[in-house]
Amino acid sequence: MYAVKLNKDTLLPREKLVQYGVEQLSHQELLAILLRTGNKEKHVMELASHILHCLESLADFDKLSLQELQQLPGIGKVKAIELKAMVELCHRIQKAKSSHSIQILSSYQVAKRMMHELGDKKQEHLIAIYLDTQNRIIEEKTIFIGSVRRSIAEPREILHFACRNMATSLIVVHNHPSGLTNPSENDVAFTKKIKRSCDHLGINCLDHIIVGKKQYYSFREKSDIF
């Protein structure tokens, strides 16, 4: 019997990953592995190619909601959930890498980072950034998704994670999906409440920052609360 010698182009994506390493796979091949199966009309590789052609770039995966993912050809609810989970896991891995030992030197530094992270979000996200004595990031924690109004009377969760991380300082950030960053009365009330609560526990609340896609508002820079 003669052995058939296979090259990269003749191997299936999983076989190619094992033999040559994940770095050698194309976007299409990686997506095909995640999809696992095709549909009645298309083989999984054809389906992966078609989906990628429907997107302007890979970054669009991060922007699509669960419902929008299901509108892509060949993507049902289960595959949409799996893709959404994959994107979020990648996002968290990248965040963990980029956050490690970063020292916060200004509100603008935080705002720039969070504009990139939250600028395209369609719901309000309330995030607390916990810092050590050198203002290095210990943890970035999503406290709430929905409306900051629900969190105004309940700063205890923010402070719970501050104590758990033994943080000496924290910065609170939330986004306005409208892109407009002027603070509302609720934003001002929330800022005063979290500042008082932090002072009571001896934790330094450095700022509350509101971000949109292209602008931000810093209470430390523009108000007398801090």
UniProtKB/Swiss-Prot annotation:
Motif (JAMM motif): 174-187
One Gene Ontology MF term: metal ion binding
Keyword annotations of the record: Hydrolase, Metal-binding, Metalloprotease, Protease, Zinc
Binding site for Zn(2+): 174, 176, 187
Domain MPN: 103-225
CDD domains noted in UniProt: MPN_DUF2466 (cd08071)
One family name in Pfam for this protein: RadC
One example of a Gene Ontology biological process annotation: proteolysis
InterPro entries: MPN, RadC_JAB, RuvA_2-like, UPF0758, UPF0758_CS, UPF0758_N
Protein family (similarity comment): Belongs to the UPF0758 family.
Name of protein: UPF0758 protein SUB0843
Native source organism of the sequence: Streptococcus uberis (strain ATCC BAA-854 / 0140J)
